[in-house]
Amino acid sequence: MAAYLLAVAILFCIQGWPSGTVQGQVRPFLEVHERSACQARETLVPILQEYPDEISDIFRPSCVAVLRCSGCCTDESLKCTPVGKHTVDLQIMRVNPRTQSSKMEVMKFTEHTACECRPRRKQGEPDGPKEKPRRGGVRARFPFV
């Protein structure tokens, strides 16, 4: 493996790193590998995907650009997973189609700040902590159940 990496590094030094590829040029392996790696990258996310209970209104824009983990891991048993997150406030126009009124408002979206390749969950395994119904239909999270 070390010999392979050394050979790739030597090729990198000989060929140089292109600032951009022109149509018809081959993009070098190291650039392809780096660009496809698991990392936070700008992703378009539909607002209704993040706020599914807000279907009575129309949002402009209908999707927002946020950083989300995406990319390839070295093994098919691994998945690119967020390990760091923060919230960003974005100004969105909300349109009420019934009244034809619109207003600007700030909506919160999660951005991924750090990503790692982690083992995939087995089919049927829950995505997170189990939820128990509470009075009034609200669900509470119990990570220890």
UniProtKB/Swiss-Prot annotation:
A GO biological process held by the record: positive regulation of mast cell chemotaxis
Lineage top rank: taxon: Eukaryota
Keywords: Disulfide bond, Growth factor, Pyrrolidone carboxylic acid, Secreted, Signal, Toxin
Ranges of Basic and acidic residues composition bias in the record: 118-131
Propeptide segment residues: 135-145
InterPro entries: Cystine-knot_cytokine, PD_growth_factor_CS, PDGF/VEGF_dom, PDGF/VEGF_growth_factor
Subcellular location: Secreted
Primary localisation category: secreted
Region of interest: Disordered: 118-145
One GO MF term attached to the UniProt entry: chemoattractant activity
Residue(s) carrying Pyrrolidone carboxylic acid: Q25
Signal peptide: 1-24
Similarity comment text for this entry: Belongs to the PDGF/VEGF growth factor family. Snake venom VEGF subfamily.
Role summary: Snake venom VEGFs may contribute to venom dispersion and prey subjugation by inducing vascular permeability and hypotension. The hypotension is mediated by nitric oxide (NO), which is produced by VEGF-activated endothelium NO synthase. Also induces angiogenesis in vitro, probably through VEGF receptor (KDR/VEGFR-2) signaling. May also induce capillary permeability through VEGF receptor (KDR/VEGFR-2) signaling.
Protein name: Snake venom vascular endothelial growth factor toxin vammin
Annotated source species: Vipera ammodytes ammodytes
